[in-house]
């Protein structure tokens, strides 16, 4: 607990990776692998993050996460999907299967540590009807507190086809968190210039956020869904 008992320090941007979701997106993984030299990496689709062993980090080690939260004076975290596993561009059924497993695992950890964690739900955004059903299941039955999607999927953020989903999220009365897509990586703008100097994070994400906000405002989403 923070020193001021009247307030809490809340971390709203805290990604997590679950063992229960490994290989739940079919051939797209995700999975933790090792190459012939024993170097551990994280694979999703044809992309490899190397070296990366999530099992030895706060992404997967809950005890380590809780220790770090205590060390930094963080009282509560909103846990959210790893943006590498948004899977907004894979076949819909694979995304549906993955998101269901992701949200079930999220609900379980929140239930076990309800004083420390809230959970955000992943959606198979490429299938609007399935996304509405999963959002309702995640909030009404699993007790998750927010909806979490990327900024780059098969249609524009202001496409009217998304209006039923936006209406459903507004009706559920939970926040919609839109995380910038992995610019320069799978499902994001492919600009090789971003690869230099780690500009994917420095400039690419800011670019994605700017485009997303422009589409939400100038595309009329906020006007059509004032309670979103």
Describe the predicted segments one by one.
Residues 1-228:
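Helix-coil boundary/capping segments in enzymes
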């Amino acid at each position: 607990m923070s020193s001021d008992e009247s307030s809490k320090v809340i971390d709203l941007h805290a990604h997590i990776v679950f063992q229960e979701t490994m290989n739940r997106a079919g051939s797209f993984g995700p999975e933790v692998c090792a190459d012939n030299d024993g170097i551990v990496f994280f694979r999703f689709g044809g992309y490899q993050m190397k070296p990366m062993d999530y099992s030895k980090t706060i992404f997967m080690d809950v005890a380590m996460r809780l220790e770090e939260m205590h060390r930094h004076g963080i009282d509560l975290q909103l846990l959210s999907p790893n943006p590498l596993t948004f899977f907004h561009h894979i076949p819909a059924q694979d995304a549906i299967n993955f998101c269901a497993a992701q949200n079930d695992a999220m609900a379980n950890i929140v239930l076990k540590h309800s004083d420390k964690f809230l959970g955000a739900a992943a959606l198979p955004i490429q299938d609007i009807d399935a996304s509405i059903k999963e959002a309702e299941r995640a909030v009404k039955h699993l007790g998750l507190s927010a909806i979490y999607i990327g900024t780059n999927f098969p249609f524009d953020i202001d496409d009217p086809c998304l209006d039923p989903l936006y209406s459903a999220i507004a009706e559920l009365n939970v926040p919609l968190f839109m995380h910038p897509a992995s610019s320069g990586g799978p499902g994001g703008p492919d600009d090789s210039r971003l690869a230099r100097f780690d500009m994917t994070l420095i400039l690419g994400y800011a670019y994605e956020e700017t485009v997303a906000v422009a589409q939400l405002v100038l595309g009329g989403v906020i006007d059509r869904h004032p309670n979103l």
